[in-house]
Amino acid sequence: MKFTRALALGSICLSAVFAAPVSDFDANVAKGLRLIQTSEDTAPFWATEDQKLDLLRADKGFFDLTETYHQVEEQKAKGIKAIVERATYPSPSKSSTVKSIISTLSTSRMQSNLATLTSYNNRYYTSSTGSSSSTWIYNQLVSIASGKSGITVSQYSHSWAQKSIIAKFNGASTSAAAVIFGCHIDSINLSSPSSGRAPGADDNGTGTVNLIEVFRALVTAGFSPARPVEFHFYAAEEVGLLGSQAIAANYKSSGKAVYAMINLDMTGYFKPGSTEVIALVTDRVDSGLNTYLRSLISAYCSIPAGTDYQCGYACSDHASWNTQGYPAAFPFEAPTVSENPNIHSSSDTTSVNGFSWTHSLEFAKLATAAAVELGSV
């Protein structure tokens, strides 16, 4: 999601929503309304789908709480807390292994996978192509993991057509806190969400193919971590972080422990003429995990960590995990002023000036390093 414009447009949209009480939840859902929250400081409110789109067009970040509302309320009533392994993240110590696996990362494979993803008219969460593109990703992951022990690939069904996917290295200690890498697989054209052309090359084809390639490289290398290492491919990020909210809430309700969650969303662009960096988001993240990522960037990447910046409320899937109480981080393609201006339209392609495969590769390197280093402790 994009998060840089002034919020005046958002306030115009907010004035039109329904201030119905949450106590009328089931009745409002039956009317087709959605429960929306736009900041920690404001109460949730009801909005139509069209009003939700108005918020998106105004670049107003929000959670759509509708799908997880009852589950989260149950967590509060029962006093369920996120299980987090609170430990100091280790200094990088697996240099030989990390660099060996990094050397096998292939931009040509990422290019090929992205060509397939962008060939779908769009990957909107309710569209047939949104569903079929998710199935294609699932099949790629299943093929990569075929015949390998200790690895599972599963689909995560939602109330909408597009499924999320979880590919998992079970780890020697299956009950240990998991290292999670996440990306969203959906795309959107804000002019015509359900049918408009939305190649979503950078948002978020890049993060998706990064994680497919990292998963492949780890499987090929015979990666066998000490703890679970998971790769999540989330449906429906563009419309209120629906997929990641569902999975994060499920992990909390199920008592699953998390060591770190690292989100890749847009990794392929930096503004021509700007300094090439890996930007680290500072809001709704774990500061200790950010510090650790800086050490990995210094050790394993060819470009530096950039000036930290805030991306805004509910800007991407890391926020779902942070809200549930888990440590999360979000390395991003560029500082806000240098991010891709072509997203959420038919122009989000690899041909735009500023798109760079060598830049995107740096994020695959970072994810590989984090998987090996964090998965080994």
PLM feature spans:
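N-terminal hydrophobic or amphipathic helices/low-complexity stretches enriched
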Residues: 69-127
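Active-site-adjacent substrate-binding region
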Residues: 270-377
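Primarily auto-inhibitory N-terminal propeptides
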Residues: 18-86
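Fungal secretory targeting signals
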Residues: 1-21
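Acidic/histidine-rich catalytic neighborhood of metal-dependent amide-processing enzymes
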Residues: 161-164, 195-288, 317
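A non-catalytic alpha/beta surface segment that caps or lines the substrate-entry region
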Residues: 112-170
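Second-shell loop/turn segments in exported
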Residues: 96-105, 119-129, 151-155, 193-204, ...
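Solvent-exposed loop/turn segments at secondary-structure junctions
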Residues: 122-125, 158-162, 171-175, 185-189, ...
